[in-house]
Each structure stands twice: as structure tokens, then as C-alpha cells.
Amino acid sequence: MPYATQADILDQLDEDILIQLTDDADTGDVVDDVVTRAIADADAEIDGYCGKRYSVPFDTVPPIIRKFAVDIAIYNLYARRKGAPEDREKRYNNAVKFLTNVSKGLISLGENDPDSTPASNAPEIENEDRIFTRTDLEDF
């Protein structure tokens, strides 16, 4: 399941701009395959960072990951042309910075966060309180 959809991208971009970024043959329509490829590339980039700490791809996509998937996919679409506008480049750089911090463990993705203490295969042992201590047996 992709982290973002074409509808998510259209929430951020006007359809006219999306047509300009995807329509190489001048048909006047959004080319779905180009959008799908940009999203897949964004997902792969996110998985590359998050895969160091999380099981990827995510079954349930955290909202922040969806947001950054959209930002990265839009940046990828602009990269096919002359380059991204300054605000889109800044959003992309912020996404990469965030994902770098996630991979280093400095930022948590919330409920999907891996346990900070790895499970052990060692048995757990509990003892009752001691009846005789060293001080009790000192003069014995």
C-alpha cells in the first residue's frame, strides 16, 4: 500500500500544475503512471530511512509519513522538469532531515515505535525475600 495517493498530491497542487509536471506528450491530462512512479520513489526513500528502526513498509501509515511521502513525491515530480520551487525544495529538505532523525532514533513515530529494550531469551526468575541475611547470621 503506497504511503500517499494521487488525491493526496492534488490536495497540495493544482491539477494544472500536476498536468504540467506529468504530461510529456501534451495530452492535457495527468499521467497516472508518472505520479505512481513519483510516489513509489518517495516510498522507497522513506523506507530506506525508516527501515533502520521499523518494519517497512508500514501496515498502518503514520500521518507524518503520509505528509512527507506527499512532499517527497511532489519534489520528485518537479525534479523531472527544471527543478522544484524554493518552498517545495525546503519541504523536501525538511522531510529528509526528519527521516534522518527517525533513523537515528532521535524522533519517534509514536505507537509504531520499536521497543527500546530488546526482548531477551533468558528466563526470568523471581525470589522470595530472604529469611536469614548476613547480619542475622553474623554471630552464628
Predicted regions and their residues:
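Ordered, amphipathic secondary-structure segments that act as subunit-interaction surfaces
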Residues: 48, 52, 64-84
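Short loop/turn elements at secondary-structure junctions
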Residues: 75-140
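Conserved short "hinge" loops at termini or chain/domain junctions
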Residues: 1-65, 121-140
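Short alpha-helix boundary/capping motifs
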Residues: 37-38, 70, 101-102
